[in-house]
Design a protein with these regions (language model features):
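Contiguous beta-strand/loop segments that form the cofactor/metal-binding neighborhood of enzyme cores
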Residues: 174, 180-259, 293-307
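Hydrophobic residues in well-ordered beta-strands that form the structural core
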Residues: 52, 68, 91, 116-118, ...
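Beta-loop-alpha module in the N-terminal Rossmann-like domain of NAD(P)-dependent dehydrogenases
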Residues: 16, 46-108, 291
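N-terminal Rossmann-like dinucleotide-binding module
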Residues: 1-45
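C-terminal helix-rich "cap/oligomerization" subdomain common to oxidoreductases
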Residues: 65-67, 218, 298-340
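Rossmann-fold dehydrogenase core element
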Residues: 104-121, 141-146
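Predominantly a Rossmann-like dinucleotide-binding segment in NAD(P)-dependent oxidoreductases
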Residues: 122-205, 211, 334
Length: 340
């Protein structure tokens, strides 16, 4: 039986708490959150012991696994404390504030022998897995162009931390990081990035809130991604991509039914995808839990088998942080930046 402690009971924490109930051999035993109303809800919903901070929960002991779902600036210290205390760690994305903190987390995992996995969930999302398989297999020929989009309204979070770059806010870092990670997972690290965007106050109003990034690989194909946190309240969160191949086109749009279509003949086809396992009521800007459950299943399966995660390694998650940080640098320098 894996005894799990959860740091953070906001929208992501609530989602993970719901899904942790679905596993055999896994028991959520404690939840930490600075907000009294969140602790009251955690006690009422799950009957667990609650703590005002994650540090105290970890220090109290009795845990096998810690899930970290707090603002990004707290990821590294909590993950390192948990692994040092003998716990395996599942940490939500982004991995940490910068590559130095990521490296410290990786060093702690190696020193303690504990498993560290980062929640880059698109690697478990059926529509993105389908695209990666198509690129790898060359079923539709060589990739010619890929464009990704992830747009929605403003997120604020506890104490408006999503609007504060110094605490890991800014949509380019917290939301667009999904598509950056997907690009690296499917295509590897580009030679350079060129990013431009609209900016507000980085401490109080979200910093780079709308960006477009070009990932430069070669002259053979083009890759770009758009991210935003500026749509009006009535506009639904939207994630989509369009991938053009030599012999076909794959299009995903989270707002359409079916969400995925392949154009490689006289008429489009909708590939059969795994059914989502549950609806979430956590306040997350998605409606289904399948990919989040899948990454949990994979994490616990790795723990049971005594193997390290390969779908998303800590080193891969650190590389995503390096590239996103370079995108931010590119936005502010208004020029393309080479990735060594």
């Amino acid at each position: 039986m894996f005894k799990v402690g959860l740091c953070g009971f906001g929208s992501m924490g609530k989602g993970h708490a719901q899904l942790l109930q679905k596993h055999e051999g896994v028991k959520l035993v404690s939840i930490a959150d600075v907000r009294p109303d969140c602790r009251e809800k955690a006690e009422a919903d799950y009957g667990v012991k609650t703590w005002e901070c994650g540090e105290a929960m970890i220090a109290a002991g009795g845990l096998d696994v810690v899930f970290i779902c707090v603002p990004t600036y707290l990821h590294a210290p909590l993950a390192i404390q948990a692994m040092t205390a003998g716990c395996h760690v599942f940490c939500e994305k982004p991995m940490a504030m910068n590559t130095s903190e990521c490296a410290d987390m990786i060093a702690a995992a190696k020193r303690t022998g504990k498993t560290l996995m980062i929640g880059q969930v698109l690697r478990f999302w059926p529509e993105y897995v389908f695209l990666k398989n198509a690129i790898d297999s060359k079923e539709y020929g060589k990739l010619i162009a890929l464009s990704m989009t992830r747009v929605g309204g403003v997120s604020t979070g506890w104490d408006n931390w999503y609007l504060d770059e110094s605490r890991g806010g800014m949509q380019i870092f917290d939301r667009h990081v999904h598509d950056c990670d997907a690009v690296l997972w499917m295509l590897g690290t580009p030679k350079a990035v060129y990013s431009y965007g609209a900016t507000r106050d980085p401490r109080t109003n979200g910093g780079i809130f709308h960006n477009f990034t070009e990932y430069r690989y070669s002259d053979d194909f083009v890759v770009s991604a758009e991210g935003s946190a500026d749509t009006p309240p009535g506009f639904p969160f939207t994630a989509c991509y369009r991938a053009v191949f030599e012999k076909g086109l794959i299009e995903f749009n989270s707002r359409l039914k079916p969400t995925l279509q392949v154009f490689a003949g006289a008429a489009p086809i909708a590939p059969e995808l795994p059914d989502p396992i549950a609806a979430l009521t956590s306040g997350m800007n998605i409606s289904t839990a399948g990919p989040y459950y899948n990454e949990q299943v994979y994490f616990f399966d790795c723990l049971r088998k005594g193997v390290k995660p390969e779908v998303v390694t800590p080193e891969a998650a650190m590389e995503t942080i390096r590239v996103v940080r370079t995108e931010i640098e590119s936005c502010r320098a208004r020029k393309a930046i080479t990735l060594s």
